[in-house]
């Protein structure tokens, strides 16, 4: 369990520090071009889930739903993590990344009722939805679990 919380803690720290910097230095809805034609730092808020799912629902309902769902997912991960063999570092790291990312965004939902997003990848006029460190950790962790599943671990 120590490594689960250590890795998750690092992800939470990176996520929250990066968001603090965005909140401090980038006005809401602003953008700074980093790699022309590909990458901006932006300051946007997401009241929904990935791709703004449920963003139009009443704020109280959204907050209760997302906080409850996050706590349920983290509880399931902690339970599953305990069953992963100690030598399976790949899967254990994947669970830790998902946990850290989920808790990083949970902190935003509790504090603000929404999530701070700031990474904007795009090609031409097509922009992927803005995301953050927590989202990246959840995505990488989920992909790692998928690879583990496909490899039969």
Describe the residue ranges of each PLM region.
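Alpha-helical transmembrane bundles and membrane-interface segments of multipass inner-membrane proteins
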Residues: 1-153
């Amino acid at each position: 369990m120590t490594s689960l919380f250590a890795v998750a803690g690092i992800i939470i720290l990176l996520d929250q520090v990066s968001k603090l910097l965005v909140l401090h230095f980038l006005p809401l809805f602003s953008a700074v071009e980093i790699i022309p034609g590909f990458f901006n730092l932006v300051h946007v808020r997401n009241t929904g889930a990935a791709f703004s799912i449920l963003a139009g629902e009443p704020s109280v309902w959204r907050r209760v739903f997302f906080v409850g769902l996050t706590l349920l997912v983290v509880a399931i991960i902690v339970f599953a993590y305990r069953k992963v063999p100690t030598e399976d570092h790949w899967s254990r790291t994947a669970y830790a990344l998902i946990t850290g990312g989920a808790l990083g965004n949970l902190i935003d939902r509790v504090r603000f009722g929404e999530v701070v997003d700031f990474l904007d990848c795009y090609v031409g006029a097509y922009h992927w939805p803005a995301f953050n460190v927590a989202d990246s950790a959840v995505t990488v962790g989920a992909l790692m679990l998928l690879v583990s599943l496909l490899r039969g671990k």
